[in-house]
Regions:
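Lumenal/extracellular "mature" regions of secretory-pathway glycan-modifying transferases
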Residues: 2-4, 20-271, 276, 287, ...
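N-terminal intrinsically disordered, acidic low-complexity segments at the extreme N-terminus
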Residues: 3-17
Length: 446
């Protein structure tokens, strides 16, 4: 009897336990999955940091200074014999196209589209690029050094430098000719923050504490609750434009240093473009460089699908501006200088030239793009046309090239649609670190 009683009690307890266990097991599985992911992520991060330490060129505290020529050319007398272009000033004069260009590629500002324009121009005219070594950037977020350039030796001459870097003027200046045009692009700080947050937040550890569906709004409610100025990749989510341009993004926005640095940027850069007025910016670029209209034709690259765009209501917009106050001051300053340049160019001429640019772009869309618009990554038929995606989500759109294209446009169409990483490979850049990271992500389905 006693044994039967024990047996009954035992079965009774087993029933209750099975119910409890059925509730606990999913939690345990979730915790196990999270722990495995955390451990794997930590190991991979450590591996990539170790890889970076081995792959990164050594710091060179002393480097023989050999002056570069006044202008570079990759074949004899190029600068002198280059065909003259009709001046954009509209006065009938002719000018030589500018060959030496430094484009400071800022993040999330349509800079990949400008990069494609520069790649095409440089390739067409056999210009020499200063490319990164092993990656698609110059070891960002470290400050740029000449030793980061693939196959660099003191005194080497380059026409174009345009990949992502953290700008360091003194180092760049020693790499390019004295006649080099310095160009960059900015974006409204609120929409810029929204774009940066979407693209980068998964690789910024302090955001992992955020809860709810709208993590950006949650962060902006009390940024200092989460933000760590010294945290890994923290720069992506606070005054990123100022950081990219080489300055401290965490200084007090009211510090006189902010205005000093902004005026320094104005002195160093010949043109600061604005994403919100992209076509007008390209017309000013053409004017500055004395290029043909055909040189600045483009398709919009690395655009996000609409479903991933956060709605910036007035409250969130205001908080994003407040949080990125230095970038707001930077943008305001160059918004003023931009319209001064447009005024000097002439409003009627600008309107006419923008219209012509848009019409030619529309014509090429009909000629080149299957369906006439960008498509989701899953709908891209040619793997060589797949754009680089942010970690954990495929939100960047791409294109399908038409099957039948007139021979006259076939090469141009493909070049205009080729994503950055693939174009760099075609230009001979060694991207072994970038490609290794891509394979790891593909294997882990990140």
């Amino acid at each position: 009897m006693e044994s039967r009683g024990i047996k009954v009690r035992f079965h009774s307890l087993s029933g209750r336990e099975s119910q409890e266990m059925s509730a606990v097991l999913p939690m345990r599985k979730n915790w196990r999955s999270m722990c495995k992911g955390l451990v794997l992520g930590t190991l991979l991060t450590s591996f990539m940091l170790l890889l970076y330490s081995y792959a990164s060129p050594p710091m060179q505290t002393s480097m023989n200074e050999i002056s570069v020529p006044y202008s570079c050319s990759s074949y004899p007398a190029q600068a002198k014999n280059f065909p003259h272009t009709q001046s954009a000033k509209g006065n009938g004069s002719r000018c030589l196209p500018q060959l030496d260009i430094m484009f400071m590629k800022t993040h999330k500002t349509a800079s990949s589209t400008i990069l494609n324009i520069l790649f095409r121009f440089g390739e067409k005219h056999r210009l020499k690029f200063a490319f990164p070594n092993g990656r698609n950037d110059f070891y960002y977020p470290s400050y740029f050094e000449r030793s980061h350039v693939q196959d660099y030796r003191p005194g080497m001459c380059f026409n174009i430098i345009c990949n992502h870097m953290r700008f360091q003027y003194t180092e760049v200046r020693k790499l390019v000719p004295v006649d080099t045009m310095f160009i960059t692009i900015l974006r409204d700080p609120a929409s810029h923050f929204e774009s940066s947050f979407h693209y980068f937040f998964r690789i910024v550890p302090f955001t992992w504490k955020l809860s709810g569906e709208d993590k950006m709004a949650e962060f902006l409610r009390d940024p200092w609750r989460y933000y760590d100025p010294n945290g890994f990749n923290a720069h992506y989510l606070h005054n990123l434009l100022f950081f990219d341009l080489g300055y401290d993004n965490n200084i007090n926005a009211e510090s006189p240093l902010v205005e000093e640095h902004i005026h320094e940027i104005e002195e160093r850069f010949d043109l600061v473009m604005l994403l919100e007025y992209f076509d007008e910016s390209l017309i000013l670029l053409r004017e500055l460089l004395c290029w043909e209209l055909e040189d600045i034709l483009y398709f919009k690259l690395n655009a996000r699908k609409d479903s991933t765009l956060s709605r910036l209501n007035s409250n969130v917009h205001e908080k994003a501006i407040s949080w990125n106050q230095i970038d707001a001051k930077l943008y305001h300053h160059f918004n003023v200088t931009f319209w001064r340049k447009v005024d000097a160019y002439g409003w009627d001429r600008m309107q006419k030239d923008v219209y012509e640019l848009r019409q030619k772009n529309k014509m090429l869309i009909k000629i080149c793009i299957d369906g006439g618009e960008a498509v989701d990554a899953s709908a891209i038929q040619d793997s060589s046309m797949q754009p680089w995606q942010p970690l954990g989500v495929k939100s960047i759109l791409g294109y399908n090239l038409k099957k039948k294209i007139d021979k006259k446009y076939r090469k141009l169409c493909r070049k205009m649609l080729t994503p950055e990483i693939q174009y760099l490979t075609e230009l001979g850049v060694n991207l072994w670190i970038t490609n290794l990271w891509r394979r790891i992500r593909d294997f882990l389905k990140w």
